[in-house]
């Protein structure tokens, strides 16, 4: 088996619906896994890429299993470092939005107090 379902899987079941061989199974606990007896990695089919990988909305839910330990280690390391160093502006956007709303409310209440 060249592909596996990772912990990044969001259980959307899209991979199981696009798998041409029905190799993606769902365990009793809801966790997805790939049956290596059924998986053909979409080789010798009309598809040019494995459909589980192509259909995954998370991009990391279905990944290729590296043949070499260190290849897998560095692939995981590079993926994690890229995620950690990516600029995340969530809190900046949150602050800008709510500080503006707070400022508007404060001015409104100050106007009411001074007008009374």
Curated annotation (Swiss-Prot):
Pfam families on file: Fer4
PROSITE patterns, per the entry: 4FE4S_FER_1, 4FE4S_FER_2
Gene3D superfamilies, per the entry: 3.30.70.20
UniProtKB keywords: 4Fe-4S, Electron transport, Iron, Iron-sulfur, Metal-binding, Nitrogen fixation, Transport
Binding site for iron-sulfur cluster: 9, 12, 15, 19
GO biological process: nitrogen fixation
Domain of life: Bacteria
One GO MF term: metal ion binding
Keyword 4Fe-4S among UniProt keywords: yes
Domain 4Fe-4S ferredoxin-type intervals: 2-29
The keyword Metal-binding appears for this protein: yes
InterPro entries found in the cross-reference section: 4Fe4S_Fe-S-bd, 4Fe4S_Fe_S_CS
Name listed for the protein in its UniProt record: Ferredoxin-like protein in nif region
């Amino acid at each position: 088996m060249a592909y596996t379902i990772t912990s990044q899987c969001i259980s959307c079941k899209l991979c199981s619906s696009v798998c041409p061989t029905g190799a993606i199974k769902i365990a009793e606990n809801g966790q997805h896994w790939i049956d290596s007896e059924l998986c053909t990695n979409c080789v010798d089919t009309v598809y040019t890429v494995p459909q589980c990988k192509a259909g995954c909305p998370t991009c990391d839910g279905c990944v290729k299993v590296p043949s070499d330990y260190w290849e897998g280690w560095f692939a995981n390391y590079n993926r994690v470092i890229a995620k950690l160093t990516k600029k995340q502006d969530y809190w900046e956007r949150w602050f800008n939005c709510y500080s503006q709303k707070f400022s508007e409310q404060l001015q409104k209440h100050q106007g009411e107090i001074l007008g009374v």
